[in-house]
């Protein structure tokens, strides 16, 4: 297959689902990983896509309604999420009562937990998170409610009622987008409601967001920028520091 033909197929796939991992593209085009990475580099230079760690996305738009699958999210920005997760794990004390939000960045945090952090107690609405925490021997609470298939997050009235019964020393949150003027946002209103309820019960809140999520706006508002500190690999715009505390893992 000629390079131009591969370019067209890559852009066609992105037009349909907005994001794609290198592995997805290899399978779709029956091409090697090295070939796909060269193609992504060239298309990125041409401004036709944004190359990110583990795959590619269409050029950013100020407002988005798309939502990648849970599996796709876990394949994107892997190293960034790992560095953020390690920094977040170091903030957890044995006596903490933690809320751990559903999402790929917070799942990376669950994987990174070790030592004293394993003695903390956790409440999470992420099914995969609860399973992993339990496997690590943590004390973990999983609220009841409706399971949302796209993210494997527990949502709905029952989840809201359960979360409102707790007080958290720290909350570690995920968001699909963070933007000046729009705050922290996510595609689904019911997930946003659960996130907001947990934030309301937390003494300290950290949003784990990699640099690809800045300047992205989704339909459902979680909270404004003042409501939580940001833990990121890199903040692309210093203006965000006017609104909240930001800790970067890349110095």
Language-model region placement:
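Conserved phosphate- and dinucleotide-binding cores of soluble alpha/beta proteins
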Residues: 2-12, 19-25, 30-32, 45, ...
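HTH-adjacent hinge/linker in prokaryotic transcriptional regulators
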Residues: 2-23, 28, 34, 38-99, ...
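Pocket-edge structural micro-motifs
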Residues: 60, 102, 209
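Gly/Ser/Thr-rich loops at beta-strand to alpha-helix junctions
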Residues: 104-107
């Amino acid at each position: 297959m000629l390079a131009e033909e591969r370019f067209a197929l890559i852009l066609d796939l992105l037009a349909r689902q907005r994001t794609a991992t290198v592995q997805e593209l290899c399978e779709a085009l029956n091409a090697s990983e090295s070939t796909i990475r060269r193609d992504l580099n060239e298309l990125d230079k041409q401004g036709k896509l944004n190359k990110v760690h583990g795959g590619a996305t269409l050029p950013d738009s100020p407002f988005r309604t798309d939502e990648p699958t849970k599996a796709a999210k876990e394949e994107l920005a892997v190293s960034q999420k790992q560095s953020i997760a390690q920094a977040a794990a170091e903030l957890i004390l044995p006596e903490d009562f933690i809320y751990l939000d559903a999402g790929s960045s917070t799942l990376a945090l669950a994987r990174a937990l070790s030592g004293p952090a394993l003695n903390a107690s956790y409440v999470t609405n992420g099914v995969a998170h609860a399973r992993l925490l339990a496997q690590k021997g943590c004390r973990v609470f999983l609220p009841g409610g409706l399971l949302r298939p796209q993210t494997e997050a527990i949502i709905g009235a029952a989840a809201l009622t359960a979360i409102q019964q707790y007080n958290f020393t720290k909350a570690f949150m995920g968001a699909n987008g963070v933007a000046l003027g729009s705050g922290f946002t996510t595609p689904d209103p019911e997930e946003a409601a659960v996130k907001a309820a947990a934030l309301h019960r937390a003494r300290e809140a950290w949003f784990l967001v990699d640099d690809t999520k800045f300047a992205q706006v989704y339909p459902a508002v979680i909270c404004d920028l003042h409501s939580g500190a940001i833990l990121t690999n890199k903040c692309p715009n210093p203006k965000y520091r006017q609104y909240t505390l930001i800790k970067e893992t890349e110095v």
